[in-house]
C-alpha cells in the first residue's frame, strides 16, 4: 500500500482577452493546489500526532504514515494461519498480529504467498514482514539455502517454540517411531521447511536398497491430502500443525502422531536486515502482549500453549 497523492490536472485555457484576468486565474489555481498539498501534510501529521497506541512512536515513519504493516504469509498452515470456511484469514499468527496492532496503532494486512517465496518477497519490498510459522535458523539469518549464499539474510523476532513431528494414517504406523524408521518408505512434506531438511538429511543416512523417498509440496494441506489418500507412508510438519491435523482431519480419524517431537526451535517474524527499527518495535510489542496476557489468550484459543515463550528475543535461532 502506498500513500495517496494529490492528482494535479491542467485546466483547458480559457479564451479570455484580458491578460490581467489570466494572471488572476493562474494565481488562484496555484493557491488552490498549494492548499491541497499543505492540507495533505497536515492531515498526515495530525494522524501521527493523535495516534494514542503506546508503541506507535517506535515504528519507522514509513509505517506510521501508511498505517499498515504488509505481512507475507503462506495461509495454508492450520492452526497458525489458514482460511476458515468463509474465506477469512484466521489462526495464531493473525490473532497475534491483531494484538500487536493494538500496541503499535497500525493494521497488519496478510497477503498469501507460497512459503518458499516469502523471504524473496521480503527482500523485494513486497512485504514489510513475513509471519508464517517460520523457524528462526542461522541459515535464514545469513541468507544461506542448501549450503549456498542466496542473498542477504533476515532478522527474526522470536515469539513461539515448535518442534517437528511425524504422523501417519491412523492405524497404519508401520512401526515408524523415529526418523531412522523411515528408510525404505515415502514421506510427504512442505517445500522449504525444516521437515524437508530433516527428510533430506535422513535420506543420506539410509542404506542402499532402503532409500527414503521424499515428495515435497507447495503447502502442508497438499501433503496431507497425499498421505490421506495412501500415496505415502508418513508426513512431517511442525509440531502444532501436525497435532492440529491429527485432531481435526476427518474428525480425528485420519492421522496419528508417531514417535517424539524433535528439533525444537523458535518461530520468528522475519524482517529485512535494513529495517532494525521495525524489528525493535515488533519485539517491544510482542513483549507487551506477553506481559498483558493477550499472547497467552491467543495460544489458549488455538490449543497451542505448549510452545509459549516468556520473552520475545531477536535472532535466537541456531
Predicted regions and their residues:
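Bacterial lipoprotein signal-peptidase II cleavage site
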Residues: 30-45
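Extended ligand-binding regions for polar small-molecule ligands
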Residues: 34, 95-98, 102-103, 170-173, ...
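Extracytoplasmic small-molecule ligand-binding "clamshell" domains
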Residues: 43-134
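Alpha-to-beta junction loops
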Residues: 70, 106-107, 124-136, 185-188, ...
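Bilobed "Venus flytrap"/periplasmic-binding protein-like clamshell domains
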Residues: 89-103, 162-219, 234, 239-243
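Acidic, polar ligand-binding/catalytic clefts
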Residues: 107-179
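A ligand-binding cleft/hinge motif common to bilobed small-molecule-binding domains
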Residues: 134-149, 200-201, 205, 228-263
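Periplasmic-binding protein-like
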Residues: 158-168, 247-284, 305-318
